[in-house]
């Protein structure tokens, strides 16, 4: 086979020196190609399909196609009692079931206008923050493996297993907990709850720092995420972004601070946002940094809750749970800060039925994913993997 000669390159064309007849014009009007990613592609984190229109290796447009995991959540809610909806919320963002339950329960409690015991409030926050850390570990670990780093994935799932064991010990389930109930909890925590949770905090704090250094000081990981998929703050706000996605664009917005609920107003913690020293504000690396730093803040919250949680022997966590829930006629919107952003519920009651007339779930994953067109435009095809991973979607919540 004849060896190709060296190429002489300028801004508009590439010319092979050994054959003057061959001239490739880089600015030719070539035909676009349609590339389908998913719905079984590993980097889509579930049954998501992206239809990408490409010009060579450059993405012109990426359109998400949803609905493969649709399970009629909102329609089911109209046919079952208020307490029976709690297990259904677990199955939306199945990586953060405690947070889903908390958002739903505080919405119904707002409609019922009932007060929750302080011990219950502190327990709710502790399990929600444990679940937040577990969710972020999945996000960081799978993001690392998407970009070719296998070891951090193993580290993340090793540490997540400690949290899964704790939550199983508390609630009886590893994932779909059905633990936070309207007006209380399914069970009070075991006797040595404080000791075991405190031991986990002590164990995990140095691990969180190690994980932070493992990726943010990795040259390959930084090159794959730095200055990729930039979302300006004003565009992120217009899209309705929330959670680590919005904070990654430099907006210091966290419902635990800006619209506090439960006992969060009593707790001292920071809301991490990128400062532009290690990343371009709004890029994939910024979104990763926010999640990595948030785990330390969750540990601070858990420690404070352990100190402030009142000791009440023979405490009945179901004492204030109504036997039959039939709220007065009206409508209410409640929301909470989930690991992926704002999860909200809009509930309408007719005052007669034990089921809601309407239960609308506001999914942060769906809203964040809606910006995929803007995020991917002009990026290279391999960078789509980095962009999708930085959004950290769960298709169970996107489709519902």
Curated annotation (Swiss-Prot):
Natural source organism: Chlorobaculum tepidum (strain ATCC 49652 / DSM 12025 / NBRC 103806 / TLS)
A cellular-component GO term for this protein: plasma membrane
Gene3D superfamilies: Cytochrome-c3 Hydrogenase, chain B
Family to which this protein belongs: Belongs to the complex I 49 kDa subunit family.
Superkingdom of origin organism: Bacteria
EC numbers for this chain: 7.1.1.-
InterPro entries: NADH_Q_OxRdtase_suD (IPR001135), NDH1_su_D/H (IPR022885), NiFe-Hase_large (IPR029014)
SUPFAM superfamilies: HydB/Nqo4-like
Subunit structure: NDH-1 is composed of 14 different subunits. Subunits NuoB, C, D, E, F, and G constitute the peripheral sector of the complex.
Function in brief: NDH-1 shuttles electrons from NADH, via FMN and iron-sulfur (Fe-S) centers, to quinones in the respiratory chain. The immediate electron acceptor for the enzyme in this species is believed to be a menaquinone. Couples the redox reaction to proton translocation (for every two electrons transferred, four hydrogen ions are translocated across the cytoplasmic membrane), and thus conserves the redox energy in a proton gradient.
Membrane topology: Peripheral membrane protein
Molecular function terms, GO-annotated: NAD binding; NADH:ubiquinone reductase (non-electrogenic) activity; quinone binding
Keywords: Cell inner membrane, Cell membrane, Membrane, NAD, Quinone, Translocase, Transport
Pfam families: Complex1_49kDa
Localization of this protein: Cell inner membrane
Main location: membrane
Protein name: NADH-quinone oxidoreductase subunit D
Matching PANTHER family: NADH DEHYDROGENASE [UBIQUINONE] IRON-SULFUR PROTEIN 2, MITOCHONDRIAL, NADH-UBIQUINONE OXIDOREDUCTASE 49 KDA SUBUNIT
UniProt catalytic activity: a quinone + NADH + 5 H(+)(in) = a quinol + NAD(+) + 4 H(+)(out)
């Amino acid at each position: 086979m004849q060896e190709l000669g060296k190429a002489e390159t300028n801004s508009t064309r590439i010319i092979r020196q050994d054959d003057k007849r061959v001239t490739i014009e880089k600015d030719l009007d070539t035909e676009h190609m349609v590339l389908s990613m998913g719905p079984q592609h590993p980097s889509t984190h579930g049954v998501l399909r992206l239809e990408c229109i490409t010009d060579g290796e450059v993405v012109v447009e990426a359109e998400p196609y949803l609905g493969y995991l649709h399970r009629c959540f909102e329609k089911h809610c109209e046919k079952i009692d208020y307490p029976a909806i709690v297990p259904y919320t677990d199955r939306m963002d199945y990586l953060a079931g405690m947070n889903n339950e908390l958002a739903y329960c505080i919405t119904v409690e707002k409609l019922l206008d009932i007060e929750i015991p302080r011990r219950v409030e502190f327990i709710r926050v502790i399990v929600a923050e444990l679940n937040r850390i577990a969710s972020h570990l999945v996000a960081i670990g799978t993001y690392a493996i998407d970009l070719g780093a296998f070891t951090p994935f193993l580290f993340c799932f090793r540490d997540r297993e400690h949290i899964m064991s704790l939550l199983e010990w508390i609630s009886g389930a590893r994932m779909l907990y059905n633990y936070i109930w309207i007006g209380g909890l399914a069970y009070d925590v075991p006797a040595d709850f404080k000791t075991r949770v405190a031991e986990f905090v002590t164990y995990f704090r140095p691990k969180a720092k190690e994980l932070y250094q493992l990726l943010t000081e990795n040259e390959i990981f930084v090159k794959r995420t730095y200055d990729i998929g930039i979302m300006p703050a004003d565009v992120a706000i217009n899209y309705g972004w929330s959670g680590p996605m919005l904070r990654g664009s430099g907006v210091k917005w966290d419902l635990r601070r800006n619209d506090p609920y439960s006992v969060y107003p009593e707790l001292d913690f920071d809301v991490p946002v990128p400062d532009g020293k290690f990343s371009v504000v709004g890029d994939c690396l910024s979104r990763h940094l926010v999640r990595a730093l948030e785990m330390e803040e969750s540990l601070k919250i858990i420690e404070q809750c352990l100190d402030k949680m009142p000791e009440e022997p023979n405490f009945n966590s179901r004492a204030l749970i109504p036997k039959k829930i039939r709220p007065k006629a009206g409508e209410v919107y409640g929301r909470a800060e989930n690991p992926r952003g704002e999860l909200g519920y809009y509930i309408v009651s007719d005052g007669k039925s034990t089921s809601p007339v309407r239960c609308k779930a506001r999914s942060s994953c769906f809203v964040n994913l809606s910006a995929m067109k803007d995020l991917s435009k002009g990026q290279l095809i391999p960078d789509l993997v980095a962009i999708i991973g930085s959004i950290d979607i769960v298709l169970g919540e996107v489709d519902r």
